[in-house]
Amino acid sequence: MKFRNILKNEKNEKNEASASTSHASEDIEIIPSRYDNEKFYSATEATHKKKTGSTGFDDTISLTHTLSRSRIPTSMEDEDAEEAEVHDTRVKRALKQRHIGMIALGGTIGTGLFVGISTPLSNSGPVGALIAYIFMGTIIYFVTQSLGEMATFIPVTSSITVFSKRFLSPAFGVANGYMYWFNWAITYAVEVSVIGQVIQYWTFKVPLAAWIGIFWVLITLMNFFPVKIYGEFEFWVASIKVIAIVGYLIYALIIVCGGSHQGPIGFRYWRNPGAMGAGIISSDLGEARFLGWVSSLINAAFTYQGTELVGITAGEAANPRKSVPRAINKVVFRIVLFYIMSLFFVGLLVPYNDPRLSASSAVIASSPFVISIQNAGTKVLPDIFNAVVLVTVISAANSNVYVGSRVLYALAQSGNAPKQFAYVTRHGVPYLGVICTALLGLLAFLVVNHNANTAFNWLINISTLAGLCAWLFISLAHIRFMQALKFRGISRDDLPFKAKFMPWGAYYASFFVTVIIFIQGFQAFAPKFDVSEFFTAYISLILLVVLFAGCQLYYRCRFLWKLEDIDIDSDRREIDAIVWEDDEPQNLWEKFWAAVA
């Protein structure tokens, strides 16, 4: 039963809440939560354990705990309660398994893959870049495993921010929420800035600013459609990406084996100019190569961002207990096929010292995918692949706005953003979140008045660090989640999805993400300190610290929740009670996409 229906009438809900509380008080001590600004109530199990010796997960304690955590309007909330009757604040669970998989894929396969890998290839060489991407791939694998375990157990919208607040502290949750929104809003600016440059591959007759403005409007409007239409659009567009990358891998294999005028290429470019790049900054070759490799880690992190989007879509998934684990389990497949294999073949077909990799005028001209096709002398295909890149970037930008709007929605739902951001259209779209996220995307116009590559790299650095902070909070939240389960006597074997290689995987990801966060701005210190470079590299970290400190002072809460205060019941029981429709693939076509998505 959904508790919002039980508490429909204000007078009845007060009486029922009072009756439920008095009845439950025989077994449970109800204590107002000190730190929750939503006026929720938390129920402790101490008295119940003392009397019954149970673990706190029998039917009585579960029902009472869930009810006690449901929002109960008080006299101070009459105005908000009346307004809630006018403004709908519930998103729709309309995303199927194939939608969720492709949304995550759409947010990941974009500028970072098709354009961004040119920098690590130039700085680190094919082998150095490959090692960097494999290493970052292991980190994102453990991050998504951690998120998957929590998101299937408690499938809520923008779970990445919700879990930080619930399992770490309110300050962590709010700071992470705003930083994660900032990350995707900035990424939207990155993607939109590239769209115009992709089109300029064909013509310069239309100003770059015009293309940026046109596609900014179109993509923003696209996000006002119902989530089901959005999911369907993203599914088919992301399908084009999958077909294009698989097609490129087959094409690249043919070229490597001698299918062009160049003859068999094999590992020719790994021998000359070499498998490892010349590095950056330092005159010492070893040091320069190491610094170049560290720089490649940052590009790899940007490329992988979006893999965790399954956690954002959990709150709008039609069957989260099945669809989210399936999407999570395909992460390894995606990392190997779409990133590692693509980078491997690009490294075989393009030498790291090709001057086009570091082109400063047109970003798309530096795409190693396009360069490799041009080197092979295949006519028309560069134009076709450029069209694929255009569709890819539009899809990625579309996902950016979707994620950003849902993060603001989750913050408003928890009382940490203006309540207006929780208002949705009759189709369940948080329209103010879409508008606010899109407005920050106007930073894309920076590339018009500045060197394209400089502005592009500036936006990437800001976005990447904000995304790395989100990965860190996911891993830390999962560590606390596992500790809370153990404290409550719950075996992880009984969860809908059990993350692999835990808890060591979460510790591994937390440690290396922290290291990368602090060393990623090394170029600000070498060869001499550069103030501008420093703020570009660390502005996201500075914002995070300010947000966290402000939230800590505002909430006056503990640095971390006590294990006994961690809430692992809210939003879970309602999902447990729902009987979902069968979403199993029915024909060969559906089975194919189920395997891919």
UniProtKB/Swiss-Prot annotation:
The gene is CAN1. Gene3D superfamilies: Amino acid/polyamine transporter I (1.20.1740.10). Its main location: membrane. Residues 1-29 are annotated as: Disordered. NCBIfam families: 2A0310 (TIGR00913). It is a multi-pass membrane protein. GO terms for biological process: L-arginine transmembrane transport; single-species biofilm formation. High-affinity permease for arginine. May also transport other basic amino acids. Residues 7-16 have a biased composition (Basic and acidic residues). Keywords: Amino-acid transport, Cell membrane, Membrane, Transmembrane, Transmembrane helix, Transport. This is Arginine permease CAN1. The chain crosses the membrane at residues 100-120, 124-144, 179-199, 206-226, 235-255, 331-351, 384-404, 428-448, 459-479, 501-521, 534-554.
